[in-house]
């Protein structure tokens, strides 16, 4: 059954991810295709509160499918965590007669969308826009593939200089408690060790592994480390321990940081964003809401937002096994 929609709002929230622009473009053009007015909201939930809205049309989103960042900007809004500011957001949405909202972001952003619907009846659809790949109900989140490729390209370059100087490099990648980037980028770049939160390796085991590698003839090594709660927490802890116990190693630390969030999205992320954006509007038209769109077995699916934001996505056990076998 097709639902009658007044107007649709779209925003990007939280940490940016490559492909957000392509998703915004798809939402806007899908709305226009279905004769529905679409408004962009600047700076995420902050824009909902301060009334920073702009009406968008098909031509207004020209030539952004290939661009990184987000034309709508993004922000983390502490105010939106409070009921009184969510009520203010509803007042502003009513001002523009917007009754449906597509939120592109990670678990915090989707939580905000869910609360807005539960408290004020605004129909919400989530698009998983985060490089961390840590949401339940989708094989890939938007921007994850681009971040992986960025990380692998950077590690490849570090590998060159590590080999030239017989150095041991600890390289930190993003993930916010999720090891997906570290595991896949580490395998793709041929890392000797990959340290992820889901597999607590321990300092002594890492020490033994490096000694074994040295005996087998390895003169340089790459160790990929998933970030902790704060940037550098894990990578400096591991590197300091090895430096104390293997002082003959020449050790360097490299934190890839925010380059993983930037850059032109890969073809995979552009196509994924386009599919997710169209599917988000389709969901609203079919009277679905408070769900996140995702991709499973190359098919568009939906999952309740409440489920999507809980737990995190399990690592592929076969990939962990592959890593153990080929990193000797």
Feature map (PLM): residue ranges:
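Short, ordered loop/turn segments at secondary-structure junctions
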Residues: 13-16, 41-47, 76-77, 106-107, ...
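Short glycine/serine/threonine-rich phosphate/pyrophosphate-binding segments
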Residues: 17-27, 49, 82-87, 101-114, ...
